[in-house]
Amino acid sequence: MKLAVIGGDGIGPEVTAEALKVLDAVLPGVDKTEYDLGARRYHATGELLPDSVIDELRAHDAILLGAIGDPSVPSGVLERGLLLRLRFELDHHINLRPGRLYPGVSSPLAGNPDIDFVVVREGTEGPYTGTGGAIRVGTPNEVATEVSQNTAFGVRRVVVDAFERARRRRKHLTLVHKTNVLTFAGKLWSRIVAEVGRDYPDVEVAYQHIDAATIFMVTDPGRFDVIVTDNLFGDIITDLSAAVCGGIGLAASGNIDGTRTNPSMFEPVHGSAPDIAGQGIADPTAAIMSVALLLAHLGEDAAATRVDRAVERYLATRGNERPATTEVGERIAAAL
């Protein structure tokens, strides 16, 4: 396995180091190449993501990312020039966000309900394509537009992926959208879900408006198995799912090219947290959980299961203790 590692900014390098510690324990001998991308490189060279680096990344089987973002760089520069460019250049059209409440982890929901679902979010379309503009900027007559692009090709491939995951899980899929208002995109999504669903007669299909889905995620999260949704709604609902599952510090993610033409990228979603960077207190659990997703994607199912179970054992016994960053990695690696 050839793995590209992008530590990135803030706590990114710290949590990534612990994730690699666990990876080495469960699957020794992975060929790792580290890439200096993020705020430091931007300040030193003015570069965000050179074409030559993109070409090098394509030669790897997967990418492990720590975090991107730094207050010394204007908002949007790193996000669009590095993060979004990676996702678009490498065709990461599936954003995978598992939502599971592990034993021993407290949820803000009463009674610590049984929560185990996955959100399959479209990752390269919607309003994140940068299509739009503004005229008469700074005047009382300013007009700004953001265009949400949805293609049959793009929707179909993420819907097929979601149905495949539902078939392997509890055989239930929920489309989340706002079809009563966003009628053009809504009809496209609804039609394709219905068309693809005919090939999966064993999977039950439901629909929820995005506003209703947020209510049920709080009041009845057990109803969800696989959620499929567009880029914007997925961005919102996945952070809510992280909150009900114990916090964003336990949220892992995968940015996946379902065709496997390009390497998929796996990362914790907690951000760079520059306020605690270098203090040795960042929780690397989400980065380690992202390694489990990475292993599963590459067909290393046994190793992925071992990491997931080691994380589960660690969380079940952690209680209110908040160990140092390196200690978390050592404990989970030892549990393997």
Swiss-Prot record:
Its cofactor is Mg(2+); Mn(2+). Its main location: cytoplasm. Mg(2+) binds at residues 211, 235, 239. PROSITE patterns: IDH_IMDH (PS00470). The keyword Mitochondrion does not apply. NAD(+) binds at residues 271-283. One of its GO terms (biological process) is L-leucine biosynthetic process. GO terms for cellular component: cytoplasm. Its EC number is 1.1.1.85. Keywords: Amino-acid biosynthesis, Branched-chain amino acid biosynthesis, Cytoplasm, Leucine biosynthesis, Magnesium, Manganese, Metal-binding, NAD, Oxidoreductase. Disulfide bonds: none annotated. Pathway: Amino-acid biosynthesis; L-leucine biosynthesis; L-leucine from 3-methyl-2-oxobutanoate: step 3/4. It is an enzyme of class 1 (oxidoreductase). It is found in: Cytoplasm. It catalyses: (2R,3S)-3-isopropylmalate + NAD(+) = 4-methyl-2-oxopentanoate + CO2 + NADH. Binds 1 Mg(2+) or Mn(2+) ion per subunit. Substrate binds at residues 87, 97, 121, 211. GO terms for molecular function: 3-isopropylmalate dehydrogenase activity; magnesium ion binding; NAD binding. HAMAP family: LeuB_type2. Catalyzes the oxidation of 3-carboxy-2-hydroxy-4-methylpentanoate (3-isopropylmalate) to 3-carboxy-4-methyl-2-oxopentanoate. The product decarboxylates to 4-methyl-2 oxopentanoate. Homodimer. Belongs to the isocitrate and isopropylmalate dehydrogenases family. LeuB type 2 subfamily. This is 3-isopropylmalate dehydrogenase.
